[in-house]
Amino acid sequence: MQLLAGERRAGHPATPPDPRLRATLALSPSARQPDAPPGLTQRFAHLRRPFMGLTGSRDDGMGLSDITAANRELPYRHAPAGIDGPNKYLLVFAGGNHLDFAGQASEAEGSLFAVRREPAVFRDNLLAASTAFWQAHLGLDAGARRWLVTDLPGHLRPTDRFEFK
């Protein structure tokens, strides 16, 4: 999804963002090979349309992976700020792991990765934030955009983090 939104992969030529995408919501976003040329700022320079990254403080990659929870924040950190007000958002749910963003874990996943089978404690906030994002940026709803930056933080747990630019 990030490639369609305008990310340039390390070591690959730049490709324009897909014009059909008006906004991107990325569950567990990432930046593979963060130290590779051309650098993260150039790699994410074309992420100009609205973008929301949803991740967790324990959202490491599955198995042997170069993705850490901190890496999940890099697309937001290196994307340009919105021109006419905030249009880039990062929501980090405390304790959230990778499978929390895939829905309810199956019995096999639960036994392999020791994850809970019930929905994540932050599920309602994830749904509210993502719905407001779509309403704000696809529906051009100024009230939803205002709620996202002013009211959403009051609904989050004290250990969750929400940023926008």
Predicted regions and their residues:
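A short linear-motif detector with a strong N-terminal bias
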Residues: 5, 30-33, 66-71, 140
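Active-site-adjacent alpha-helix of alpha/beta-hydrolase-fold enzymes
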Residues: 45-124
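Primarily recognizes the serine-hydrolase "nucleophile elbow" in alpha/beta-hydrolase
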Residues: 1-47
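Structured segments of extracytoplasmic/periplasmic soluble domains
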Residues: 3-6, 27, 50, 82, ...
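Active-site-proximal helix/loop capping residues that flank conserved catalytic or ligand/cofactor
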Residues: 22, 88-91, 128, 132
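Intrinsically disordered, low-complexity boundary segments flanking structured domains
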Residues: 11-14, 72-81, 148-151
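Sequence-level motif detector for i,i+2 pairs with an aromatic at +2
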Residues: 21-22, 85-88, 157-159
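Alpha/beta-hydrolase-fold serine-hydrolase catalytic core, especially in secreted/extracellular enzymes
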Residues: 95-98, 103-165
